[in-house]
Amino acid sequence: MARDATKLEATVAKLKKHWAESAPRDMRAAFSADPGRFGRYSLCLDDLLFDWSKCRVNDETMALLKELAVAADVEGRRAAMFAGEHINNTEDRVVLHVALRDTSSKEVLVDGHNVLPDVKHVLDRMAAFADGIRSGALKGATGRKITDIVNIGIGGSDLGPVMATLALAPYHDGPRAHFVSNIDGAHIADTLSPLDPASTLIIVASKTFTTIETMTNAQTARKWVADTLGEAAVGAHFAAVSTALDKVAAFGIPEDRVFGFWDWVGGRYSVWSAIGLPVMIAVGPDNFRKFLAGAHAMDVHFRDAPLEKNLPVMLGLIGYWHRAICGYGSRAIIPYDQRLSRLPAYLQQLDMESNGKSVTLDGKPVSGPTGPVVWGEPGTNGQHAFFQLLHQGTDTIPLEFIVAAKGHEPTLDHQHEMLMANCLAQSEALMKGRTLDEARAQLQAKNLPASQVERIAPHRVFSGNRPSLTLIHDMLDPYALGRLIALYEHRVFVEAQIFGINAFDQWGVELGKELATELLPVVSGKEGASGRDASTQGLVAHLHARRKA
């Protein structure tokens, strides 16, 4: 069936009425009255558990949300994506990052062409190159083994590889990995200063080889190599992830060190492609393939499972409920895993660049809110930074906890137990809160004077009823990481279909880039600022004055 706008509008109205009149208000009471609540509002895929029972939903909520998914034709749009239809309508492109990790299909067609042999060819070339670097068969220009790799990229060419490389630190047995993204010269200067060009490989990741930040940093790195080792050494110390073979050749990188990908792979969905080359070099081709296999397992589940048993669908529906019905404008991602420290930033781009839209697929203004602000930090660090606001602030911010049952350090298992206890405690505290009577009783137990009890007790009240969901897997390994990232990719897709927007373009990135190009000669003093707004003129004048001071 196609998207049913009339039914969708009616279901949204029913959900809003339900939220106002009959959604759970007291989560303590909801759990007391329903011992089976956890079982009904949780799902498993193998060892991966998704629990949303602490969210303010009941059976009526879930029935209406499923009705919403049907009206939005989530299943039809899902099928269209997997079938290679041009669902990115503003750029007339198919959306097939799922093909990058497809190990079970015989063919995946893009405009009649089976792309799986192409995907396999690039993956095999990546593996051969990675093995060569890791083993020392591919050496630097002076014959030294490569000990460090520096990936230069930005956005999807940086966030995914950084996140995955940090997450898979226990599997690193290759060269050390470093990442440069910011055009701020401090970033590349600080990265290169402790390294030796003779044992460093630099990967330049830019599909067009024109991205300003990436190419500026790449030229700086090229000069660093050439000034030390000579111009002829450049080719032995660079590789590229790009489709612009002419520009790559002009830069001095041989074609056998260039790895391409396709326009049906969006930047924020590209870590599975050649963009993941630094990850593969760090952890090895076998572990990278396990990373792909985990994502593929989630793809198959998302494609085949019925709506009510489908983890990405249910995660997306809860996300929509929180954003569009409950009115929560923010979403906190809190992985209780230090190695997932960059996951919030990765999901921030994935979600906000995909669903930060204000017009529908047909170019009309949306009728309600779309994607939330996504942010976060690892636990337990966040508890000592911003959890005060999450517990007692005036805004309700849903939290998404992620934790593993087992850590990688058996001799430090007691610390992992403390980590898990903190994660579950925060989830419980947000839900239960603490009443005024409970706060008084706690203070009275300390034998404080009655006047002091009455003065302090209100400050120790927690409202509770603050929603959170929890994801638990056995251990953060390559397979589990791939599965987790694919879960969030498909969740974003589900929410976009209900919002009625295109999750696969990012026109909001363009205007600032265009104006930066115009302003560069103004900031550098080659052109005047006349014709620009008074604020920009004033800022330019101040910068000029301070640079001369």
Curated annotation (Swiss-Prot):
It is an enzyme of class 5 (isomerase). The keyword S-adenosyl-L-methionine does not apply. One of its GO terms (biological process) is glycolytic process. SUPFAM superfamilies: SIS domain. Keywords: Cytoplasm, Gluconeogenesis, Glycolysis, Isomerase. Its main location: cytoplasm. InterPro entries: G6P_Isomerase, G6P_Isomerase_C, Phosphoglucose_isomerase_CS, SIS_dom_sf, SIS_PGI_1, SIS_PGI_2. Its EC number is 5.3.1.9. GO terms for molecular function: carbohydrate derivative binding; glucose-6-phosphate isomerase activity; monosaccharide binding. It catalyses: alpha-D-glucose 6-phosphate = beta-D-fructose 6-phosphate. The keyword Cytoplasm applies. The active site is at residues 353, 384, 513. One of its GO terms (cellular component) is cytosol. It comes from the Bacteria. It is found in: Cytoplasm. Pathway: Carbohydrate biosynthesis; gluconeogenesis; Carbohydrate degradation; glycolysis; D-glyceraldehyde 3-phosphate and glycerone phosphate from D-glucose: step 2/4. Catalyzes the reversible isomerization of glucose-6-phosphate to fructose-6-phosphate. Belongs to the GPI family. This is Glucose-6-phosphate isomerase. It comes from Brucella suis (strain ATCC 23445 / NCTC 10510).
